[in-house]
């Protein structure tokens, strides 16, 4: 009996001691698991993880933190602690505590260099290589078979390229592949653009697909026609120009969207806003907003998600806004909710503090018109 009591008190003392040692060791003596994770949203079904270095972890645990009054910048990179996304890392290598809304004061120089190298490696592993249509046409020849991975759901299916002079005309390989593709589009075929990775024996490439069967189909796969995959510099048959929505999704699939938003023109901001609201893709919308409008986005997400379709019906102005600080753009939009469809003239009020800074859209004024 004494031996049993002795063992009990010994284990209890060890557990208490471990608790005082801090969160780096669990009650079972196992070290907490920390890892990088990269994904376009916390809910994304596709993510890439990598071990988080112990020396940076110590810096995070023992470093000085400062409260922030602004929202955490849009990012695709996080630190996961025991399966929970606890911290965010922006593209300037700042680390934020997501629950406490704090920023870690600058990392030690050696840790910052390590973090930079890790971010580059993680980025390469997760996203697709940005290749031109000329390269894609060569690397993915007609009748080649490759895999398509949807960046948001993480679902993948196999396709065969059948044709296409300006972009790839492809078909799901089997009935099962068709079912997976339709699941990605929530059970309904759609012209909506989606960011994808094209996985072939020649590499991992950034692309954009739509989900509407059209034209001819030759495979016995239950898919009535083919669909299109675009790469950088691909053009549509009708316009002979690169489709802006496909271009946005290609930037998303290559991991360049967050940085690319700094260079968008007012006209591109309008189209990106419409696309993001239509597809409820807040990863696209958030980085083109400033802090004030990002807070508004969080407050009005439910209201925006009630919009089932939004489409631009009129042309954008060709006026150059390179020397301006404000730029109102009025377009005709079709807006559909469960209550019905309306066509209306809507003004996007775009502004920037200086000509060196990126454009943003006044979300509050836009919401009142939608």
Annotated model-derived regions:
Residues 27-63:
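Short Lys/Arg-enriched alpha/beta "domain-start" segment
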Residues 2-27:
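Sec-dependent N-terminal signal peptides of Gram-positive bacterial secreted proteins and lipoproteins
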Residues 136-139, 320-370:
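Exposed beta-sheet edge and beta->alpha loop/turn motif
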Residues 180-268, 275-276:
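Exported/periplasmic cell-wall-interacting domains
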């Amino acid at each position: 009996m004494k031996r049993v009591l002795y063992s009990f008190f010994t284990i209890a003392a060890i557990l208490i001691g471990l608790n005082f040692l801090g969160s780096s060791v669990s009650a079972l003596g196992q070290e907490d698991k920390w890892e990088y994770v990269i994904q376009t949203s916390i809910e994304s079904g596709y993510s890439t993880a990598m071990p988080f270095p112990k020396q940076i972890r110590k810096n995070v645990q023992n470093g000085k933190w400062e409260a922030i009054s602004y929202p955490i910048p849009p990012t695709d990179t996080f630190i996961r602690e025991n399966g929970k996304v606890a911290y965010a890392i922006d593209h300037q290598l700042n680390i934020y505590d997501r629950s406490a809304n704090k920023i870690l004061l600058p990392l030690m120089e050696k840790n910052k260099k390590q973090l930079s190298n890790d971010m580059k490696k993680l980025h390469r592993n997760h996203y697709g290589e940005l290749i031109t249509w000329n390269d894609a046409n060569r690397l993915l020849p007609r009748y080649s078979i490759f895999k398509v991975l949807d960046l948001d759901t993480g679902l993948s299916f196999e396709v065969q390229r059948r044709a296409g002079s300006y972009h790839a005309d492809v078909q799901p390989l089997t009935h099962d592949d068709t079912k997976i593709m339709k699941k990605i589009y929530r059970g309904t075929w759609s012209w909506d653009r989606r960011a994808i990775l094209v996985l072939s024996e020649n590499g991992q490439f950034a692309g954009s697909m739509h989900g509407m069967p059209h034209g001819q189909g030759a495979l016995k796969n239950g898919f009535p026609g083919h669909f299109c995959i675009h790469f950088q510099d691909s053009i549509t048959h009708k316009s002979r120009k690169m489709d802006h929505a496909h271009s946005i999704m290609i930037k998303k699939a290559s991991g360049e969207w967050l940085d690319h938003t700094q260079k968008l023109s007012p006209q591109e901001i309008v189209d990106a806003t419409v696309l993001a609201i239509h597809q409820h893709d807040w990863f696209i919308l958030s980085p083109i907003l400033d802090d004030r409008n990002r807070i508004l986005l969080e407050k009005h997400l439910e209201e925006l998600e009630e919009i089932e379709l939004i489409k631009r019906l009129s042309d954008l102005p060709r006026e150059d806004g390179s020397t301006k600080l404000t730029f109102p753009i009025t377009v005709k939009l079709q807006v559909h909710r469960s209550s019905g469809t309306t066509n209306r003239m809507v003004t996007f009020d775009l502004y920037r503090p200086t000509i060196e800074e990126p454009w943003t859209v006044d979300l509050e004024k836009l919401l009142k018109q939608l």
